[in-house]
């Protein structure tokens, strides 16, 4: 029984590791939904004033989406790899197609949160009703065979989202709210459909154009995840041991806890890596092959003696697709 449970946990671990991008996007979407709900309850207050309603409603949908989009670009490691590539290599090894695909990957990942925000805002309809209530045609409104009063129609319609109108206009207010919420939710569902189609077509195009088999792509993704995890863990240990050695040289001793003593005893650090080595393993990476053997990352390429030491020029390798 214990062996079966352990096997199931191992399977789930491998599954989630292979689907880390999908899970990350899902968590981003859920976080955005929660933030949108909190914003609607705490911060959203329609001014209910002509001209201001429109600006406030658009800002409530567009400004948070723009901020989330910029944050998504900033938090994406590919962004800074591309910046490093432009700084150190001037993208001399990147053709137009891989560069376009890499930018699409960065923008696509960054668009998850803003698209989710926009969809939830449209499905809720509050911002849309606030923005467009004053633009409803008064002549199209009827309630109990009564027509909407034409005097000060724009001002009256602009106050509908706040429900501050006389009771005799409550039926008109419900009709305006129902009509605008219908339009808002329709746009929200259309946006969901368009995004779903684009994601499907992008995945199909990616796998169709890829020269790698599905299994090798999965292996490549697992390798990148494992390499990044091990690199970060090792860099943390290396920097800690190096810092302890330098502090010891300055003071003559260093105050260490038991875990730090074990780290220094097990992982002696003799020196640091020069800047050219860091530059060699940093930047945009395309899948490459050297003499028929795959190179799965810049670190893999450097470890094989093909980068940073003049052993072989970059054009010996074959760029196939962006990681």
Swiss-Prot record:
It catalyses: ATP(in) = ATP(out). Residues 145-152 are annotated as: Hemichannel docking. It comes from the Eukaryota. GO terms for molecular function: monoatomic cation channel activity. Residues 1-21, 77-101, 207-323 are cytoplasmic. GO terms for cellular component: plasma membrane. The keyword Translocase does not apply. InterPro entries: CALHM (IPR029569). Disulfide bonds join 46-130, 48-162. GO terms for biological process: ATP export; calcium ion import; positive regulation of apoptotic process; regulation of microglial cell activation; regulation of synaptic plasticity. It is found in: Cell membrane. Placenta. Inhibited by Ca(2+) and ruthenium red in a voltage-dependent way. Residues 14-39 are annotated as: Central pore. The chain crosses the membrane at residues 22-43, 53-76, 102-132, 180-206. It is a multi-pass membrane protein. Its main location: membrane. Residues 214-251 are annotated as: Intersubunit interaction. Pore-forming subunit of Ca(2+) homeostasis modulator channels. Mediates ATP release from astrocytes and ATP-induced Ca(2+) influx in microglia thus regulating neuronal ATP and Ca(2+) homeostasis, synaptic transmission and neuroinflammatory response. May form intercellular gap junctions. The gating mechanism remains unknown. Belongs to the CALHM family. This is Calcium homeostasis modulator protein 2. The gene is CALHM2.
């Amino acid at each position: 029984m214990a062996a079966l449970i352990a096997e199931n946990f191992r399977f789930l671990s491998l599954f989630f590791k292979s689907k880390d991008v999908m899970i990350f996007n899902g968590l981003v979407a859920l976080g955005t939904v929660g933030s949108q709900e909190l914003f609607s309850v705490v911060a959203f207050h329609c001014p209910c004033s002509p001209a201001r309603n429109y600006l406030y409603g658009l800002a409530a949908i567009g400004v948070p989406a723009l901020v989330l989009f910029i944050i998504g670009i900033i938090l994406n490691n590919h962004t800074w790899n591309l910046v490093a590539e432009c700084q150190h290599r001037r993208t001399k090894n990147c053709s137009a197609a891989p560069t376009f695909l890499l930018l699409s990957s960065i923008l696509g990942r960054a668009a998850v949160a803003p698209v989710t925000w926009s969809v939830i805002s449209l499905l809720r309809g509050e911002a849309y009703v606030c923005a467009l209530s004053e633009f409803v045609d008064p002549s199209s409104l009827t309630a109990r065979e009564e027509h909407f009063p034409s005097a000060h129609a724009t001002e009256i319609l602009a106050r509908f989202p706040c429900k501050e109108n006389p009771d005799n206009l409550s039926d008109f207010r419900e009709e305006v709210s129902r009509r605008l919420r219908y339009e808002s939710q329709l746009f929200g569902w259309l946006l969901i459909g368009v995004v779903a189609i684009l994601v499907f077509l992008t995945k199909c195009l990616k796998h169709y154009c890829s020269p790698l088999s599905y299994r090798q792509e999965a292996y490549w993704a697992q390798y990148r995840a494992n390499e990044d995890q091990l690199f970060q863990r090792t860099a943390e240990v290396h920097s800690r041991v190096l810092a302890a050695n330098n502090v010891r040289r300055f003071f003559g001793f260093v105050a260490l806890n038991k875990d730090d003593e074990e780290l220094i005893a097990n992982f002696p650090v003799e020196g640091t890596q020069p800047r050219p080595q860091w530059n060699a393993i940093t930047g945009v990476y395309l899948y490459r092959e050297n003499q028929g053997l795959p190179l799965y990352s810049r670190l893999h390429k450097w470890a094989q003696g093909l980068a940073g030491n003049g052993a072989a020029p970059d054009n010996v390798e074959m760029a196939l697709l962006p990681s």
